[in-house]
From Swiss-Prot:
Record keyword S-adenosyl-L-methionine present: no
Stated name of the protein: TonB-dependent transporter Oar
GO molecular function list: carbohydrate binding; siderophore uptake transmembrane transporter activity
Effect of disrupting the coding gene: The deletion mutant is impaired in PopC secretion and does not accumulate the intercellular C-signal protein (p17). Disruption of the gene results in a severe defect in the development of fruiting bodies. The deletion mutant has a growth rate similar to the wild type and displays normal type IV pili-dependent motility and gliding motility.
Start-end of Polar residues biased regions: 709-722
Entries under Pfam families matching the protein: CarboxypepD_reg, OMP_b-brl_4
Domain (TBDR beta-barrel) ranges: 248-1061
TBDR plug domain segment(s): 121-243
GO cellular component, one term: cell outer membrane
Highest taxon of source: Bacteria
Function as written in the Swiss-Prot or TrEMBL entry: Required for secretion of the protease PopC across the bacterial outer membrane. Binds and probably transports PopC from the periplasm to the extracellular milieu. It derives its energy for transport by interacting with the trans-periplasmic membrane protein TonB. Required for cellular adhesion during fruiting body formation, a multicellular developmental program that is induced in response to starvation.
Origin species: Myxococcus xanthus
Membrane-related topology note: Multi-pass membrane protein
Gene behind the chain: oar
Intracellular or extracellular location(s): Cell outer membrane
Amino acid sequence: MHLNRVLRETGVVVAAGLLYGSAAFAQSSTIIGTVIDAQSRQPAADVVVTATSPNLQGEQTVVTDAQGNYRIPQLPPGDYTLRFEKEQFKPYARSAIQLRLNRTIRVNVELLPEALGEVVEIVGAPPTIDVGSTTMGVNVDQEFIKRIAVARPGGKGGATRSFESLAELAPGAQNDNYGVSINGSTSPENGYVVDGLSTNDPAFGVNASPLSIEFVQDVNIITGGYMPEFGRSTGGVINAVTRSGSNEFHGSVFANWTPGTLEGTRKQIREEGTVITGQNQLQNLGDFGATLGGPILKDKLWFFAGFAPSFTRYQHTRTLNALRVDDEGNTIKDETDFTVADAIPGSARKYYADSRTIQYMGKLTYLINQDHNVSFALNGTPTSTGGLGKLSVNPQSGGLPGVLATRPGDFGLTETKANTTSLALKYAGAFADKKVLVDANLGWFHQTASTLPGDGSNLGDRTGLAGYSRMVYTTPRALTLFEALPEGQEGACGSTPEEQLVRSPVTGYGVGGPGFMSDQTLDRYQANAKATYLLNALGTHVFKAGVDVELLSFDQVKAYGGGVFFQEGSNYGVAGQGPAVHDARRYGYQTGPDSAVTQFTQVAKTTSTTVGGFLQDSWSIANRVTLNLGVRYDVQALYGGNGDLSLLLGNQWSPRIGAIVDPFANGRAKVFVNFARYYEQVPLNLMDRAFPGENRISARRSLAEPGQGTATSCDPSSFESQQATCNTDSNLLAIPESSRNVNRFYTGGTVGGTPVDPDIKAQSSDEIVVGAEYEVLANTRLGASYTHKDMNSVIEDMSRDDGNTYFLGNPGSGFAGEFPTPVRNYDNVTVYLNRTFADGWLAQANYTWSRLYGNYPGLFRPETGQLDPNILSDFDLIELLENRTGLLPFDRTHQIKVFGAKEFNISNALSASVGVSYRGSSGTPINYWGSHWAYLQDESFVLPRGAGGRTPWINTIDSNIGVNYRVSKDSVVSFTLDVFNLFNFQGVNTVDQTYTLRDIKPIPGGTPADLENLPGRVEFQDQAPRDEPFGSVDGDVNKNFKNPLSYQAPRQVRFGIRYTF
């Protein structure tokens, strides 16, 4: 280290700078360091070290020990000033120390004797390497947020600018259906923490609180390598701490607006097999609100409050088309091999999808004395979308309406509401001169979620929308069979039924009521406490131990409109029985053979109790080696709808072992390795569906074409026929004797719980992380890491008798030994360069190579969007197990993320900043999906995973421009302009992977060549035989297969204005 002696009046030097230490996802941070005599180079004992910050009530004071070491724990993140004082030394104050969330930073100091007239000054910037931790991830604060375009409009939490959206900034992270996938896991596997308490949905595991980044001070995205203090997550952790008051009144008034008029052109989605097109266009999206914080009693009692409504409106244009034909009546293809279609004049109809959220929060922080404080926080996020005649924005995924292949008047039938309320009480205390620390949290996270009929009818009613069943026709039919064409265009699709089928085919067309509906109430009661003890013995030990308890409950009423969801299906291959309609989903039971009873609602309240504890030690040796050692134990008891204990998951021992070496002992480099085992906390949806099991019955009925119902044939397009013929036994089709049990017409209906393997093991994954970092320039570090993750035991339901009965176990072991072992192997190599914001600019860049391979995607099925943790369809049926091993849906071989920003000071009052970001990623695997006679669409892998190649690369460039004008000393007006997808790239996000809607068998180990020269190469499933070979009937192969289903979100421009005081 280069030293330069200069004469000076002050008498101190900061020697080792800021050395980032242990990171975890608690809600406070720590400053540590060593103080020495600059002349004698000996430790300086009994030096008084005082920390102050605008975010800290009062001040925190400690005294150095005999070795000159000090530790100031339980600090909120913020900018700090440290004062060092002792009689024989000149006093010193070091300011502008940035302490981020969940960090331990080191500030080493050399004090000069009072009599010495010169000071030893260090030339160069302090190191920025985190030498005490193996934790991987990124920390996002308000400094980054205001300079880089983040929280893209649209998507989940888009209008609210949810803290969860920041997770995709981390290397190895990507957006998935319900949030952000981290290192190959699915979003419900992540832990979501706000102010020390979980915001995970107790039933499904996803983040349930889209809390605005306006209310958040820091967000820490942990991708792996964390200590045993934290568990119940097999993915990453998104940890946020909300803002607090201070000794000065401060606040903001803000507004953000994304107008649809400036949106880039959306590429039209063209679908084969249907003449209905749909286009979503943003109308308005934004949020506005205010925050205020300050003292009620200075240095004693602070408050912070915020209020932020947000709104979203999309316009969906539904258009009817007619296929163009030649002189011989054959359809015409264009140069891209799409069938040429002409829009029918006057057919375009506009519908609106609205979403509204009101967010609020309040927080009180009380300082009992210097060593003890408590805080209480309240926040809520009520959201509503849809309504009668309106479309919905899915609150769980942010998904927009797809093509409305549904009869006009039969969509826009429900209103969806999602409301969360969180209460959190936190205590932090220090004893024995801050050698013993105690932290405790107590909280309640309450949710209501419902999708109910828009006309006000109640679930289970036989009248109104609640009594109206949904029907889907899977075989191509003429549009004119369901809808009247605009006046004057009656002949646009032809004049005969045959011509109309050629020129206006629709596939997967829906009629009827709202389908599945539910009304849910969920609660998560949480309590945890931990104690930390600092010991100097053969180095420095930070021992920590703790316990925590979580009580979950899930109360749900669920129903299908009219008591049943109909879908066109096979007639069992019996000649003369004609077309069939399948009771695809009907709740009910049987009191005897063929004595079915329909349940118009199913009601269940399920609960869970989880108790855990941990012990860990972070042992630092000679400022060169740190060993992080610990173990965690959890046990979860789950209770079914009858109140009985249904599943007990113990023996959840989670070892965590890490080592960090600082080879030069100067904080400018590190090499590290870590092993960890993580266990899942099973969400309650499993209990709701399986304990006792869902009572479902199924049958097939004689299907009448729309408008042609009779006393013995069901016309589900008619409400009257649904209420009469479709719910009687007069139109039932007999099950072939070869597959018949005691029932001639019905399957299912068995009442009872799901058997559980007595040796079932909790679900877990293992992780190994190896990496190195080196500070190549001041504030700039270069790093590389390798991560491997794989699954141990997985909990899933399975069936040996074609779905008549199910049991719960670990596929591949125990009672389920003949089922394939779940595999999800993830390998990741990341190279990154990070420059923290300094000297007016920041830069971050990372490249990730990864591979995700196996037969188990996670806690939801990306293929169908099925969100049923631990009870997915992947291992249900033996006949569907073929071809499921391969590259998994979120396998992206390459990912590149680059962020940069520069700030310009134009005058004392005026400044500006420019930020640019680039994200690029390779495509995802394409599959060949088929249908299943009982599980319906996209449940069968006709060919092995990934046999269809990959989707294209996706490239996105975003920009940020900010202008700040200082009105007075403490008030600033800011204007921001965020442009997302600056060049309006329209890369293909997803393609249609439905090869067929027919119930065909997988081809084990097959290739695309096996599907050439149809018919005759593919077999139908045994329960859905057909006389005509597959490929001989129009509609057997999906005409839209591999065509784009979605493109990148277009260019969107967000304006922001803010007054801060």
